[in-house]
Amino acid sequence: MLKPELSNQFKRDYNILTRRGYDITRLDAVIIILLKQLPLEPRHRDHPLKGKWHGYRGCHIADDWVLVYKIDGDRLKLMLSRTGTHVDVYGQ
């Protein structure tokens, strides 16, 4: 099982989503799946990212709610970088 490593930005994003009334249990469920190194369901649309986020992966918690993460297999860490809407995370 991987150990989570949360960026400061991820912590801020998490708090913002909580204040906005998002169902955080949906995010927590995806994080648990990733920590156990199990495959995500196709509805999460897990995919590698490009550009500024090259080397990271993105998945959908809901239609306009994404999680940006990276797995460091050498250190057995799940690095949680960002979460929020597409605009929050990617500025688009």
Predicted ranges, named:
Residues K11, K50, Y90:
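Nucleotide phosphate-binding site architecture
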Residues L2-K3, S7-N8, R43:
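Basic nucleic-acid-binding interfaces
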Residues I33-H60:
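A short, surface-exposed loop/turn module that caps and links secondary-structure elements
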Residues K3, I16-T25, A29, C59-V66, ...:
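Enriched for short, Lys/Arg-rich terminal
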